[in-house]
A protein has these predicted regions:
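Conserved, single-site charged/polar hotspot
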Residues: 1-218
Length: 218
């Protein structure tokens, strides 16, 4: 089973590289397709619904799949805020008042809370968001012979550097559904690689190991 929480518990880093995949604002897979490829070694794909595939090139296509039962989402939206820190302050105040806030970034920093039976006072300066959905964005593995529906999280890895739509990034990735009904590309970086690569670049490779570890946590 693919479990992102387990990766975090192991001390690995999960970095969101690109959000809103499959949506109209998707700038990475604007043609609704992600291509993962390597120059030498094979790629391996594992989907949460049991689909497994191994090749030097993997195509994932986003499709809007009709729902048998449409659903409606309601939430109260605060913002937009100029920065994450401003949104965080608002979220803290809402939590102190007994609400369950979520800090998000669909286009700007916002704070969302669920709609309850009694709406908060308008003095809190929020907007009511309500939207009905009759389809969902679903990833499909496609090749020249067939296509297979995938379920997230999806894990894609290789011993080689992986090229995604022409851009070389790393060699371990996840695709996971987000709070907006779209998908996020997440890079997995193991703690040892982070200490050897990113952190020495930030504070100097000659720094003591303990200092590097502290910087990684920060």
């Amino acid at each position: 089973k693919i479990n992102l929480d387990q990766e975090l518990k192991k001390g690995n880093f999960l970095i969101g590289l690109k959000q809103y995949l499959g949506a109209n604002v998707d700038s990475l897979s604007g043609n609704k397709k992600l291509t993962f490829e390597t120059k030498n070694n094979f790629l391996t794909l594992h989907s949460s619904n049991g689909v497994k595939y191994k090749a030097k090139k993997i195509n994932i296509l986003w499709q809007a799949v009709p729902l048998e039962i449409p659903y409606t989402i309601e939430r109260l939206v605060f913002g937009p805020f100029a920065s994450y820190e401003s949104a965080q302050k608002k979220a803290i105040r809402l939590k102190e008042e007994g609400y369950n806030p979520q800090i998000v970034y669909p286009k700007d920093w916002e704070v969302w809370i669920p709609v309850e039976k009694e709406l908060p006072s308008k003095k809190l300066n929020y907007q009511l968001f309500k939207k009905s959905y009759n389809s969902e964005i679903v990833p499909f593995f496609v090749d020249e012979y067939s296509e297979q529906k995938l379920e997230g999280p999806i894990y894609i890895s290789s011993d080689d550097e992986i090229i995604i739509n022409g851009v070389s990034v790393g060699n371990q990735f996840y695709l996971a559904k987000d709070s907006y009904g779209t998908w996020t590309l997440i890079q997995k970086i193991e703690i040892d690689d982070y200490l050897k690569g990113v952190i020495p670049h930030e504070i100097g490779s000659s720094s003591p190991l303990e200092a590097l570890k502290v910087q990684a946590v920060i």
